[in-house]
């Protein structure tokens, strides 16, 4: 039986070998007919080969430059750093992390300061190529960039994402600089720059277009790094895919926070990791014009206390068309809202050259450059400010009042996508109002009362939860900062023309009764008779101003002035011109009497217990005709 089984066993082995070879051949045919898609490494390498190193971006296939800032407690709440020392006090080995964890706090209590910070570097994960192909394109054909793209409506964040996804990541912008700018040759020895881009769920193509625009237009010798700060984005594409993409771009680093910091906190985080001489804070939906960086660095190299910004051109959110802006200055109003103001014809003629730097009261928040050490030594951003609103006002006031200056440079141009007004990602109104209160309490000195008069709800909120600005006021004294009246007199006098500035302000006290002028009406106060009431710091209605125009302004959102009807003092709309203007003129005498200029009579409080209204009477100097304001403003403060 054994001789019969052996041939059967040999045939079985031969059949198995033939079957194995057949399967191998089938597999090879399948691979040849259906090759796998190129890897990310191959795709990016092929893309890079289309561009020269001088004009394009270079790639580095080393380790991913990604840092994750970790805290044990997770959450989407906005939070600045508990226990994190002020930026000015950080040492080089402490500029690592922006979110402190409970474990770190326990370490700090043991006496080692560095233990308050965790710094974790993660290897990047494999990216999602299907999502990548779905949400962005990398066409770089110049002709395709001229294709007419159909505008669509805005997404929830106010951007036309479908149109943006169809637009090439790299496109040539129209030349909008003045011809003299093209004759400028950057000098050698300019400082290096760290460009900090903070984002939260930014559209993928918009973010990458900003990154490549910087890489393509900034000289490599001057660009120290681009630091991307992910402020807890939730989009999947901004996680693993972005990590892999950034890993292959030279001089681009990615920082992630696992707690929502807001724009101010995220910019602070990027600043702590930056190594360039100059910090350039830029929104993550910009495109840079060639030659945008050199003028910024040149002006800062000449004076490290300068805070500078490019001309901000407009990229339409509907069509993504790039439009040049005329020369503007950044200004503000008494509600502490930022305003663009066109440079007038006379102001342009006063410039030494069409490309001369423009002094600006306020720097725009879209793109701003500042020397890194100057930023540190002047306290960086105010840690009390939340999210991202009004930080440009704080930086501008600090620069002007503490020995620096603010400029907009015509030869530096950067386009910015201004989101649709229907965007749902605006800052919380109450948070924005709190930021304004902090700035008013910190920088406006006595002029904060004017701010509160324009926003009564801010006055009410400040009484409920007044911010503790002690540390910032100490910083002002340490830096030897000027007061806000210097800003009004020397930087932006248009905000407060001399004849509108108060000679006296605050509560108007009647010497005879020890009470204050007030309006007791509810609702509409137009025509309200003025009366006496117990003095209170919590009543905005008692905050008055006597101006250089001899008006007595009422402390409310409306511009109302003391007027006279039938011998009684009432509130009426302030008159700017015409004969009726004299009806609202009051002369405040040194002896305390307030004389109505048109009639020559004095303002007097009623002496009856049931009637404390204000009337006009013949001047006789009795105590019911004597008044005083809380504050007197010398001429040099007006």
From Swiss-Prot:
Which residues bear sugar attachments? Answer: 573
All residue ranges annotated as the Ricin B-type lectin domain in the record: 503-630
The UniProt record gives the binding positions of Mn(2+) as 283, 285, 416
Pfam families registered for this protein in UniProt: Glycos_transf_2, Ricin_B_lectin
TM segments? Answer: 13-35
Pathway(s) it belongs to: Protein modification; protein glycosylation
Which EC numbers does the record give? 2.4.1.41
Top-level class of the enzyme under EC nomenclature: transferase
Which cysteines in this chain are paired by disulphide bridges?
181-411, 402-481, 516-535, 561-574, 602-619
Ranges for the region named Disordered are: 134-157
Instruction: Provide the reaction this enzyme catalyses.
Output: L-seryl-[protein] + UDP-N-acetyl-alpha-D-galactosamine = a 3-O-[N-acetyl-alpha-D-galactosaminyl]-L-seryl-[protein] + UDP + H(+); L-threonyl-[protein] + UDP-N-acetyl-alpha-D-galactosamine = a 3-O-[N-acetyl-alpha-D-galactosaminyl]-L-threonyl-[protein] + UDP + H(+)
What does the entry list under GO cellular component?
Golgi membrane; transport vesicle
What is this entry's stated membrane topology? Answer: Single-pass type II membrane protein
Entry domain remark: There are two conserved domains in the glycosyltransferase region: the N-terminal domain (domain A, also called GT1 motif), which is probably involved in manganese coordination and substrate binding and the C-terminal domain (domain B, also called Gal/GalNAc-T motif), which is probably involved in catalytic reaction and UDP-Gal binding.
Protein family per UniProt: Belongs to the glycosyltransferase 2 family. GalNAc-T subfamily.
| The name this protein goes by in its record | Polypeptide N-acetylgalactosaminyltransferase 15
Which species is listed as the source? Mus musculus (Mouse)
């Amino acid at each position: 039986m054994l001789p019969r089984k052996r041939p059967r066993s040999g045939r079985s082995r031969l059949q198995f070998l033939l079957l194995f070879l057949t399967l191998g051949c089938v597999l090879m045919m399948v691979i040849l007919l259906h090759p796998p898609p190129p890897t990310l490494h191959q795709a990016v390498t092929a893309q890079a080969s289309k561009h020269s190193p001088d004009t394009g971006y270079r790639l580095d296939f080393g380790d991913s430059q990604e840092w994750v800032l970790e805290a044990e407690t997770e959450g989407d709440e906005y939070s600045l750093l508990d226990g994190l020392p002020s930026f000015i006090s950080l040492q080089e080995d402490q500029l690592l992390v922006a979110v402190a964890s409970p474990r770190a706090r326990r370490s700090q209590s043991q006496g080692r300061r560095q233990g308050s910070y965790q710094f974790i570097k993660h290897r990047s994960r494999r990216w999602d190529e299907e999502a990548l192909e779905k949400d962005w394109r990398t066409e770089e054909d110049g002709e395709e960039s001229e294709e007419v793209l159909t505008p669509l409506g805005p997404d929830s964040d106010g951007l036309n994402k479908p149109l943006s996804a169809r637009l090439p990541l790299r496109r040539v912008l129209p030349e909008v600089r003045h011809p003299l700018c093209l004759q400028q040759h950057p000098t050698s020895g300019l400082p290096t720059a760290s460009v900090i881009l903070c984002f939260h769920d930014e559209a993928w193509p918009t973010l990458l277009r900003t990154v490549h625009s910087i890489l393509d237009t900034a000289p490599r010798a001057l660009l120290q790094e681009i630091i991307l700060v992910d402020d807890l984005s939730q989009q999947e594409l901004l996680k693993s895919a972005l990590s892999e993409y950034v890993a292959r771009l030279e001089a681009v680093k990615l920082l992630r926070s696992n707690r929502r910091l807001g724009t101010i906190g995220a910019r602070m985080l990027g600043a702590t990791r930056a190594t360039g001489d100059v910090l350039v804070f830029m929104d993550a939906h910009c495109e840079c014009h060639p030659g945008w960086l050199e003028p910024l660095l040149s002006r800062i190299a000449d004076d490290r206390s300068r805070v500078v910004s490019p001309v901000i051109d407009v990229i339409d959110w509907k069509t993504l068309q790039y439009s040049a802006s005329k020369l503007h200055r950044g200004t503000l109003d008494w509600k502490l809202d930022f305003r663009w103001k066109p440079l007038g014809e006379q102001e342009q003629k006063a410039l030494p050259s069409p490309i001369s730097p423009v002094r600006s009261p306020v720097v725009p928040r879209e793109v701003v450059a500042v020397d890194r050490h100057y930023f540190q030594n002047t306290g960086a951003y105010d840690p009390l400010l939340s999210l991202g609103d009004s930080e440009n006002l704080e930086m501008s006031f600090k620069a002007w009042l503490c020995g620096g200056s603010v400029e907009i440079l015509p030869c530096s141009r950067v386009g910015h996508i201004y989101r649709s007004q229907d965007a749902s990602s605006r800052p919380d109104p109450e948070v924005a109002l709190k930021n304004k209160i902090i700035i008013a309490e910190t920088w406006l000195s006595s002029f904060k009362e004017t701010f509160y008069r324009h926003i009564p709800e801010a006055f009410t909120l400040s009484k409920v939860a007044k911010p503790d600005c002690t540390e910032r006021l100490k910083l002002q004294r340490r830096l030897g900062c000027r007061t806000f009246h210097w800003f009004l007199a020397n930087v932006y006098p248009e905000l407060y023309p001399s004849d509108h500035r108060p000679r006296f302000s605050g509560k108007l006290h009647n010497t005879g009764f020890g009470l204050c002028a007030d309006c007791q009406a509810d609702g509409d106060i137009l025509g309200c008779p003025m009366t006496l009431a117990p003095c209170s710091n919590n009543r905005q209605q008692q905050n008055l101003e006597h101006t250089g125009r001899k008006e007595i302004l009422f402390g409310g959102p409306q511009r109302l002035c003391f007027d006279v009807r039938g011998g009684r003092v009432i509130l009426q709309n302030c008159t700017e011109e015409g004969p009726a203007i004299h009806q609202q003129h009051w002369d405040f005498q040194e002896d305390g009497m307030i004389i109505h200029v048109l009639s020559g009579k004095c303002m007097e409080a009623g002496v009856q217990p049931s009637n404390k209204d204000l009337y006009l009477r013949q001047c006789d100097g009795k105590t019911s005709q004597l008044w005083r304001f809380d504050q007197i403003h010398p001429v040099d403060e007006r």
